[in-house]
């Protein structure tokens, strides 16, 4: 897997924030994109429902971090995302991780897609799509997810101008700095255990995807097609391989916050462009090593979740299209196959017997 020289070089973890019930009416949030200069996007989110909403900011248009706010396509091909994918604790959420959007209120933001995508001179399609977990106004307990999809905009990009935009994530970081902040004895022990459990869970889930119950597979991936089962099995097998070694592999695993994205309730995060995975302090303090409860979070499935994000594990890497059982099982098959939590939830279900 990688090497434990203060950094736990290897691959993954992180489970993510999410909702519990089912998706709401797609029309509750009206998301609109408008093209700005070159790769700049102006986005608005309007609450067109009758109730105030407390929306989880992480991983959405409300997030100030370089997260995947839009999907970028060149023709039919998705342009790789080069920002950060953060895993969020689903319980005991802090008030500051939410954005309250009153009924009838509109939130506006602008960002440059070139900060987290490599764009050349070409024509691209930008669209925002996903599921935002929310709590009732005044509460921080996730009650459901809202599925949304914006209009698609066509953008002509000047490649030279796009290249001049500073990247949100550098291509590499100072390894000496990483080596100065290493794993404690307890962190190393917890991470090693999580990796071992991750390998076992991923291996069992891979076998189940190949030849197990088609009904159970369809529950999480919305199809029983042999081609999709093969892809899911292969990705899980690759995760098992990465989790099985501490001294070799294609990803790097850190016990400390080398990029500075461990904010409130963040368990871990992945930088897909560099195949780096980072544990946050609450990964160790808030999660059990392995849960026996259906669809609950633990260190093992958080690690499995993060491994699927890294394209070096299996390409393409997954995204965070839906957090938690309710949102993940509301996805289409095409989006579920590229959703990290779908793999974590499926592996948990196979292990627990959900």
UniProtKB/Swiss-Prot annotation:
Its cofactor is Zn(2+). Belongs to the peptidase M35 family. Pfam families: Peptidase_M35. Zn(2+) binds at residues 305, 309, 320. Residues 1-19 form the signal peptide. PROSITE patterns: ZINC_PROTEASE. Secreted metalloproteinase that allows assimilation of proteinaceous substrates. Shows high activities on basic nuclear substrates such as histone and protamine. This is Neutral protease 2 homolog BCIN_12g06300. Its EC number is 3.4.24.39. It catalyses: Preferential cleavage of bonds with hydrophobic residues in P1'. Also 3-Asn-|-Gln-4 and 8-Gly-|-Ser-9 bonds in insulin B chain. Gene3D superfamilies: 2.60.40.2970, Collagenase (Catalytic Domain). GO terms for molecular function: metal ion binding; metalloendopeptidase activity. The active site is at 306. Disulfide bonds join 183-255, 262-280. The lineage of its organism: Eukaryota, Fungi, Dikarya, Ascomycota, Pezizomycotina. Keywords: Cleavage on pair of basic residues, Disulfide bond, Hydrolase, Metal-binding, Metalloprotease, Protease, Secreted, Signal, Zinc, Zymogen. GO terms for biological process: proteolysis. It is found in: Secreted. It comes from the Eukaryota. GO terms for cellular component: extracellular region. Residues 20-179 form a propeptide. Binds 1 zinc ion per subunit.
């Amino acid at each position: 897997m990688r090497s434990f020289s203060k950094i736990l070089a290897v691959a993954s973890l992180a489970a993510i924030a999410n909702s519990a019930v089912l998706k709401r009416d797609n029309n509750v949030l009206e998301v609109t994109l408008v093209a700005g200069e070159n790769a700049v996007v102006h986005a608005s989110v309007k609450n067109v429902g009758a109730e105030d909403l407390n929306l989880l900011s992480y991983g959405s248009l409300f997030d100030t971090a370089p997260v995947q706010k839009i999907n970028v396509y060149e023709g039919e091909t998705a342009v790789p995302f080069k920002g950060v994918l953060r895993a969020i604790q689903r319980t005991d959420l802090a008030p500051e991780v939410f954005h309250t959007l009153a009924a009838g209120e509109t939130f506006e933001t602008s960002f440059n897609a070139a900060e987290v995508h490599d764009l050349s001179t070409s024509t691209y399609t930008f669209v925002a799509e996903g599921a935002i977990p929310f709590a009732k106004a005044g509460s921080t307990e996730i009650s459901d997810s809202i599925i949304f999809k914006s209009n698609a905009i066509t953008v002509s990009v000047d490649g030279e101008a796009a290249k001049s935009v500073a990247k949100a994530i550098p291509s590499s970081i100072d390894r000496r700095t990483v080596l100065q902040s290493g794993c404690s004895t307890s962190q190393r022990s917890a991470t090693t255990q999580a990796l071992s459990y991750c390998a076992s869970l991923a291996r069992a889930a891979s076998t189940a995807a190949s030849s197990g119950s088609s009904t159970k597979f369809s529950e999480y991936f919305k199809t029983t097609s042999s081609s999709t089962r093969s892809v899911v099995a292969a990705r899980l097998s690759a995760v098992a391989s990465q989790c099985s070694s501490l001294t070799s592999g294609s990803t790097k695993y850190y016990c400390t916050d080398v990029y500075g994205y461990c904010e409130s309730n963040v368990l871990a995060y992945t930088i897909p462009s560099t195949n780096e995975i980072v544990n946050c302090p609450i990964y160790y303090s808030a999660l059990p090593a392995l849960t026996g409860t259906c669809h609950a979070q633990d260190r093992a499935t958080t690690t499995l979740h993060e491994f699927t994000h890294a394209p070096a594990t299996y390409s393409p890497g997954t995204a965070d299209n839906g957090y938690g059982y309710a949102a993940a099982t509301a996805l289409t098959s095409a989006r579920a196959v590229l959703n990290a939590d779908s793999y974590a939830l499926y592996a948990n279900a196979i292990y627990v017997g959900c």
